[in-house]
Amino acid sequence: MAKADKKPAEKKPAEKTPAAEPAAAAEKKPKAGKKLPKEPAGAGDKKKKRSKKNVETYKIYIFKVLKQVHPDIGISSKAMGIMNSFINDIFEKLAGESSKLARYNKKPTITSREIQTAVRLVLPGELAKHAVSEGTKAVTKFTSS
């Protein structure tokens, strides 16, 4: 009988406690619910504005060129990331080389001539020739418009 007495004793407080807790929790939740969304929402908006950085990528342009060359072929996000890194790397090398050339010639400005020479130095053979011709064409188009 001692075991039978213990079970109802355990069940009765368990039944009373959940009935009391939801009522207390229901009373507290709307108050907390009203206060909490306002503060984190305001803080969340500020954090989003602060943490949002303008990360410049070439993904749009890579995709446009891909569609010009092969309209039926797609590209995975990993491959796009690799292409973006590749372009950043090449541009960094070209900028560094053209900067060195300007310093060697004791000139404060990097002109299209320094860029063209840097392209010839950084890129190999045929690729350099094609890059120079495309660059010249782009500069001509830009200056004429």
From Swiss-Prot:
Biased composition (Basic and acidic residues): 1-15
Main location: nucleus
Covalent cross-link Glycyl lysine isopeptide (Lys-Gly) (interchain with G-Cter in ubiquitin) as placed by the record, residue numbers: 141
Region (Disordered): 1-53
Modification N6,N6-dimethyllysine occurs at: 12
Biased composition (Low complexity): 16-25
Keyword hit for Ubl conjugation: yes
Entry superkingdom: Eukaryota
Gene3D superfamilies in the cross-refs: Histone, subunit A
Record-linked PROSITE patterns: HISTONE_H2B (PS00357)
Keywords: Acetylation, Chromosome, DNA-binding, Isopeptide bond, Methylation, Nucleosome core, Nucleus, Ubl conjugation
GO molecular function terms listed in the Swiss-Prot or TrEMBL record: DNA binding; protein heterodimerization activity; structural constituent of chromatin
Chain positions with N6-acetyllysine modification: 6, 11, 16, 28, 34-35
Annotated positions of the N6-methyllysine modification: 3
Cited function: Core component of nucleosome. Nucleosomes wrap and compact DNA into chromatin, limiting DNA accessibility to the cellular machineries which require DNA as a template. Histones thereby play a central role in transcription regulation, DNA repair, DNA replication and chromosomal stability. DNA accessibility is regulated via a complex set of post-translational modifications of histones, also called histone code, and nucleosome remodeling.
Subunit and interaction comment: The nucleosome is a histone octamer containing two molecules each of H2A, H2B, H3 and H4 assembled in one H3-H4 heterotetramer and two H2A-H2B heterodimers. The octamer wraps approximately 147 bp of DNA. Interacts with ORTH2.
Descriptive protein name: Histone H2B.10
Organism expressing this protein natively: Arabidopsis thaliana (Mouse-ear cress)
Record lineage: Eukaryota, Viridiplantae, Streptophyta, Embryophyta, Tracheophyta
